[in-house]
């Protein structure tokens, strides 16, 4: 009788995988909370569970510092970039999650600056499936019932994002991509106000995201056809040996790039960014704008620097073109916007171009500068979107009738006139984030742009540096324009007001602002750290 071979199961390195296992475990428990915990106790339970999970995963990341190994039969790499990016994702997620946890009921109506004490700011529908203004929604609003499904969705997204930059083979990378993408599609549709716009943006994101994921999977198949493997280090060895049909490799890399460049929001795969950033609930926008970019750039760096260093001369010119187009279209597109969230979305596209400048440097300094830039940009982005979500129309509305027009978010730049003068502290902090985006000295943005430009120049990519400096000058215009409107324009009849944030949200804003200033005034400790960590395990 012939023995049937048994596929060996991979040895699970629980210690090395502990940050991701903690987040996946907490996400599963969060689903059980939704099923079994009474509705009245879910919010506190979910918030406590998420807090414990994020803190536990962060402690596990710190405990693994210095680890340099490949586990799960080559599927997952635990090294400096992995742990650094996982730490960034956890901290940025924690800051955004605080805002997601804000809830209000009919009895707790938020107040405008100068009009009394502040309250919670609820950005999420009581029941996303109900028609806006319908009787079921009115009943839910009157009873103070709020949905908490956002917590398990967010936790699964965080877990997938932590796995994404750690993946050492293309199939695991695809699974991680879907694990964090699918919750984001749903989260974008949960807005309490402007529900149809929110659902439209989610549908666009889902359709385009599915399309890009198909390209990624198809590209993985072509790379496998070339190398006979999907492990990144084995692909690199096959490339060095020129072991297969080169056209398969180049076509596969092109398709992989479509999937990855879509996630970072690079031109020409950026069209979803303005619509989704505008339509999604602002706390979700803050979360995804920072963490998705961190995770996706980590995966892009690993693919290019671990699997494809042997064909740098092939992918580098293409990346140059993508970076230049992304910087130009992002900067010019932002100038034409009159909606603050869409302006910040085009700003995010431009920053993707700056980050690609560091990636295209194709040297170790390019990796370290990109890692630094991700930290600087991530925290400024979270803080900026949190404050943007606090600008509301002037009259508080209890929402008992299901109509929240009187407490809608104000994103029309014209209606931001005088907002900074009416709430000077929050206005100054928001101006700080905008100046950091512009790359003004003594902010994190200046140091991060200088770092990627220096790396690109050292790698012989001076055209990218020239375009980057030019686009930074263009960007300064639209950032300063917002500041001028906030502080120097006379208020209009329907000007918005800044709601007073609660203590937890205030802490999130303060932490984001503090990091933005520290990375601009004293960046050397983090620069030294990323230089020591910029070494991928192979």
UniProtKB/Swiss-Prot annotation:
GO CC terms, sorted: plasma membrane
GO terms (BP aspect): ATP synthesis coupled electron transport
Membrane topology, record value: Multi-pass membrane protein
Main subcellular location of this protein, as a coarse class: membrane
Domain of life of the source: Bacteria
Catalytic activity: a quinone + NADH + 5 H(+)(in) = a quinol + NAD(+) + 4 H(+)(out)
The keyword Ribonucleoprotein is assigned to this record: no
EC number per UniProt: 7.1.1.-
Compartments in which it is found: Cell membrane
Subunit structure: NDH-1 is composed of 14 different subunits. Subunits NuoA, H, J, K, L, M, N constitute the membrane sector of the complex.
NCBIfam families: NDH_I_N (TIGR01770), PRK05777.1-4 (NF004441)
Stated family: Belongs to the complex I subunit 2 family.
Name of the protein described by the UniProt record: NADH-quinone oxidoreductase subunit N
Species: Mycobacteroides abscessus (strain ATCC 19977 / DSM 44196 / CCUG 20993 / CIP 104536 / JCM 13569 / NCTC 13031 / TMC 1543 / L948)
Gene: nuoN
